[in-house]
Amino acid sequence: MSTKIVETITLECETGNYHSFCPISCVSWLYQKIEDSFFLVVGTKTCGYFLQNALGVMIFAEPRYAMAELEEGDISAHLNDYEELKTLCIRIRKDRDPSVIIWIGTCTTEIIKMDLEGMAPKLEYEIGVPILVARANGLDYAFTQGEDTVLAVMAHRCPDQEFPIGESKETKKKLFPFPLLKENNLVEYANHPPLVIFGSLPSNLVSQLDTELRRQFIKVSGWLPAQRYADLPSLGDGVYVCGVNPFLSRTATTLIRRKKCELIVAPFPIGPDGTRAWIERICPVFGIEAQSLEEIEERIWESLKDYLDLVRGKSVFFMGDNLIEISIARFLIRCGMIVYEIGIPYLDKRYQAAELALLKKTCIRMCMPIPRIVEKPDNSNQIRRMRELKPDLAITGMAHANPLGARGIGTKWSVEFTFAQIHGFANARDVLELVTRPLRRNENLDNLDRTTLVRKNNK
């Protein structure tokens, strides 16, 4: 089955199955982003082993997440789920005093039909702490969609837009009749409707993107998620929202339908080309002409010249894992690489429409063939295609890395792109560092001429 998106870009769907990292791993970066939160994963021992081993954090470090481990009594309905969770949440409130507790549902809670959404409102009223329920099970969601479900639930708790657009400055003067020292050094922003950016990024990346928009006289009203639960941005009619990650389609839908926000459909700020396109898409919405972006982008490309010489002409194959494959592929094509195939667990064609258009534009600019995009790819079919194509690099899940490496194909874990800082102008070098590491390693091994190092007559 194939569906045409734009000219010469076709989507294929092979199996309908997900082959990706577990979505409950979103806990690893969200608990660090939302500083006053506590994540409670409701699952089995397997989920606990995964969180402890895959995330590399020992329970003795007392991170702000924990496991509510399901036992045989829970599955056979011999235990009262509400009382068990209540005991845990009271202990969490006493020990950690979080501003919000987030329950993460897993595969097991789906299978036994545990009514987490039904228990949460009653329990949060009893203990006096907000409780959000996000289902991040691997049955329905791919790797990074765990964050998508959490942000979609959190969007429901965002306050409504308090002041009519254009009145907030006057209202502030009424609240604070004295001069505010902090505002003396601020940039004079253009008068535009509120803009909220959604997507979890480290604080330094948030500052970088805020700064880039500030240079265009655009003020970011808030981020979803915020560093503190109490600082969630106000949402409502007249508020514009824009995403920074390709896997947040559910959050975007919630913001449009439930909170009545206006979505700015833009490419994602990954790579200098994507960051420039992201800003250029936001500026016209507020009647602002983007300035100096071309010079900034050219300067970044010039600084990447040593990497570009290494990757130019090399081929890459995306097996699909974290839903940011199209953005990474577009950036690598702009760097001069040949992308044979883009496997992706799930693709929302409306949310990624601008990214797909930029992919096509980039391929035409670089005189490259537009890569095949395969949604929910069949791994067996992919392996056969890779044997025929013989790519220099495969960006894949961890399960396939070693077998592919044994067959002479350079590999890079897709999970590394998820945890690395790849957004904005300044971090394009980090993306290329990840990509070129296996290429450099293979070249160094070839230069060693390994066959001459083995003694034929070893006595």
UniProtKB/Swiss-Prot annotation:
GO terms for cellular component: chloroplast. InterPro entries: LIPOR_BchN/ChlN (IPR050293), Nase/OxRdtase_comp1 (IPR000510), Protochl_reductN (IPR005970). PANTHER family: LIGHT-INDEPENDENT PROTOCHLOROPHYLLIDE REDUCTASE SUBUNIT N (PTHR39429:SF3). It holds the Pfam family Oxidored_nitro. The lineage of its organism: Eukaryota, Viridiplantae, Streptophyta, Embryophyta, Tracheophyta. GO terms for biological process: light-independent chlorophyll biosynthetic process; photosynthesis, dark reaction. This is Light-independent protochlorophyllide reductase subunit N. GO terms for molecular function: 4 iron, 4 sulfur cluster binding; ATP binding; metal ion binding; oxidoreductase activity, acting on iron-sulfur proteins as donors; oxidoreductase activity, acting on the CH-CH group of donors, iron-sulfur protein as acceptor. Its EC number is 1.3.7.7. The gene is chlN. Binds 1 [4Fe-4S] cluster per heterodimer. The cluster is bound at the heterodimer interface by residues from both subunits. [4Fe-4S] cluster binds at C22, C47, C107. It is an enzyme of class 1 (oxidoreductase). Its main location: plastid. It comes from the Eukaryota.
